[in-house]
Regions:
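Short alpha-helical segments that sit at the start of domains
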Residues: 1-21
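Short capping segments at the starts of secondary-structure elements
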Residues: 18, 29-36
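Hydrophobic residues on short alpha-helical segments
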Residues: 21-27
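A short acidic, leucine-rich amphipathic alpha-helix
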Residues: 36-40, 55
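Key DNA-contact positions within bacterial/archaeal DNA-binding proteins
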Residues: 46
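Residues within the DNA-recognition helix of helix-turn-helix
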Residues: 51
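Beta-hairpin "wing" of winged helix-turn-helix
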Residues: 58-72
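Conserved segment of winged-helix/HTH DNA-binding domains
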Residues: 69-97
Length: 97
């Protein structure tokens, strides 16, 4: 599959931070609530949210809001999407030719 330069850049940026790699690993085990991820990483929810947004933009994760029984607040859960990262010379040729 030929990727655009923009897609390649988003993927590269998403994988360029150790916290985001750790988030991918954590989400490979099960879907998680953002506060649970923040607590386990010992980071603020805001910082984890920024990392997850970058992973979501690159197509690695997806999220949804849910209302839990006995709790009227919406909770944002994240899960890993199936992915296979490859950068082929053919992609580069198509982008720059």
């Amino acid at each position: 599959m030929t990727q655009s330069l923009e897609q390649i850049v988003y993927i590269g940026m998403a994988l360029a931070h150790p916290v985001r790699i750790q988030l991918l690993y954590m989400l490979s085990e099960k879907e998680r609530y953002i506060y649970e991820l923040a607590k386990d990483l010992n980071l603020s929810r805001q910082v984890v949210d920024l990392h997850l947004k970058r992973l979501e933009k690159a197509g690695f994760v997806e999220s949804d809001l849910r209302l839990e029984e006995n709790d009227m607040r919406a909770k944002k859960f994240f899960r890993l999407k199936e992915f296979d990262v490859k950068l082929c010379t053919e992609d580069l040729k198509n982008i720059f030719s």
